A protein has these predicted regions:
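Bacterial N-terminal signal peptides
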Residues: 13-23
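Formylglycine-dependent sulfatase
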Residues: 2-10, 26-411, 417-471
Length: 471
């Protein structure tokens, strides 16, 4: 039996209106949905450690794909060339001197009583005002007491370790062997265990990150994935050992690359890649004194802890299909800029108070330069300033080596011509030296210096700390 369908113009009209409304609603929902943000922060990865940055033997196909499909920065900088202050700068958009995240010990240790002030506004705490789900996975290192931990800085969840993976009794430092507790692994404020096998950390962090993305695929989210690698001691899973020509260091970097690949694949499967801004970078330059276990600064001078380019300039790739152009960008940008740039995507009228970062939206989406200056600090002291192509040292770059001393200052380099900082041009360019000197003094005079949060030692460690420092 055949069923005859009659065409009723009125019915067709209502069907047309119904589907039009659904289509409009879906398009409107996609248009208005806030973007997701993922920051993947490697630990001690050097400027020259990725295939897309010229490494001859370390294979990083997923990060290279990110670079090919997005924006590869050649002049991207951190807020400090060492761990704790660099992480504070990324999350707050402020130079560490403004938040007190500096000190003679360079970073926070398990015996420290201080940390990042909970009153500081972070990317996570700001995004919570716009109904974002937020997660910190991996390494924190901004204070291990409860009031300084991620849950008090805008993160809904934390899964990882409170400080560096080498701050444990098993290390080579005699003070740590005698005094530091076993390295704790936390889920929120709960300790899952101590002295866990670090060879599984990259896999654990990746799995947890993917779970977070899956759980929040239908709402805006911010994921801060801060790997503990390739910081020493180098640890990686059994199935990834012995795969890289570069040896163990190469194995670790390649496992991080595969982790990035899994996250990108997850975004694609969920059909949210086009609405997710992913940025991969490093907290500072490579650990130069780790020898074969450390990374490469490429053609740049200096390493982690240095005010030379190799300490401050890091690999960085931004990826957001159909939004971020496929280009190698020579524009200046820094981790300080991530806070204002991310918040401007959510609220164009967001008020940024007392921050040092710039909104580099035009750089990210149009490859238009915005930033002109980079400040290089050692603890709370400005050592050098980059202004456009010129970099001026006003203080001794490294008082512990046989290089230039304070009496040799100032030093002037054309960074675009001489990224290795070999040729001092100060005597040939007195007007440029004078101009940059004025910029340095203006910056020093206008920058608030907060008291250091590093100095206080927990009472349980004070006597051992004092005894050790008598030696």
């Amino acid at each position: 039996m055949q069923i005859k369908l009659e065409r009723n113009p009125k019915h067709l009209a209502w069907v047309f209106i119904f589907f039009t409304l659904i289509t409009f609603s879906c398009n409107n929902d996609n248009h208005e949905r806030k973007p997701n943000f993922i920051i993947i922060f490697a630990d001690d990865l050097g400027y020259g450690d990725l295939g897309s940055y010229g490494h001859p033997t370390i294979k990083t196909p997923y990060l290279d794909q990110m670079a090919n499909e997005g924006m590869r920065f050649t002049q991207f900088y951190v807020g400090s060339s060492i761990c704790t202050p660099s992480r504070a700068a990324l999350l707050t958009g402020k130079l560490p001197v403004q938040t007190g995240m500096y000190g003679k010990r360079s970073v926070l240790f398990p015996d420290n009583a201080g940390g990042l002030d909970p009153k500081e506004v972070t990317i996570a705490s700001a995004l919570k005002n716009y109904d974002y789900s937020t997660a910190c996975i991996g390494k924190w290192h901004l204070g291990h007491l409860e009031q300084y931990m991620p849950l008090n800085h805008g993160f809904d969840s934390f899964f990882g370790i409170p400080y560096s993976n080498d701050m444990r009794p098993e290390g080579k430092w005699d003070y740590a062997r005698e005094n530091f507790p076993p390295l704790p692994f936390l889920d929120g404020s709960d300790t899952l265990g101590v002295s866990l096998d670090q060879s599984n950390f990259i896999k654990m962090f990746t799995k947890k990150s993917i779970e977070f993305i899956l759980e929040n695929r239908n709402q805006p989210f911010f994921l801060y994935l801060a790997h503990t690698a390739p910081h020493t001691p180098l640890m990686l899973s059994k199935e990834n050992k012995g795969l890289s020509i570069r040896g163990t260091y190469g194995d670790v970097v390649e496992e991080i690359d595969r982790s990035v690949g899994e996250i990108l694949k997850t975004l694609a499967k969920l059909n949210i890649a086009k609405n997710t801004l992913v940025l991969f970078t490093s907290d500072n330059g490579p650990w130069g004194w780790a020898n074969i276990d450390g990374g490469s600064s490429g053609l740049l001078k200096g390493n982690k802890g240095s005010v030379y380019e190799g300490g401050y300039r890091v690999p960085a790739v931004a990826w957001m299909p159909k939004s971020i152009p496929r280009v190698t960008s020579t524009a200046l940008a820094t981790t300080l800029d991530l806070f204002p740039t991310i918040l401007s995507q959510v609220d164009k009228d967001f008020e940024f108070k007392s921050i040092d970062g710039f909104d580099i939206t035009k750089t990210l989406f149009e490859n238009t330069p915005v930033r002109t200056d980079v400040h290089y600090y050692r603890q709370d002291t400005l050592i050098a300033l980059r202004h456009k192509e010129w970099k001026l040292f006003i203080k001794d770059p490294n008082p512990w080596d046989d290089g230039p001393k304070q009496e040799d200052m100032p030093l002037l380099y054309n960074i675009e011509h001489d990224p290795s900082e070999k040729y001092d041009l100060a005597k040939d360019n007195p007007e440029i030296v004078q101009k940059l000197n004025i910029l340095c003094q203006d910056h020093i005079n206008s920058t608030y210096k907060a008291p250091s949060k590093y100095e206080a030692i927990l009472p349980a460690y004070q006597s051992a700390y004092d005894e050790y420092n008598k030696k």
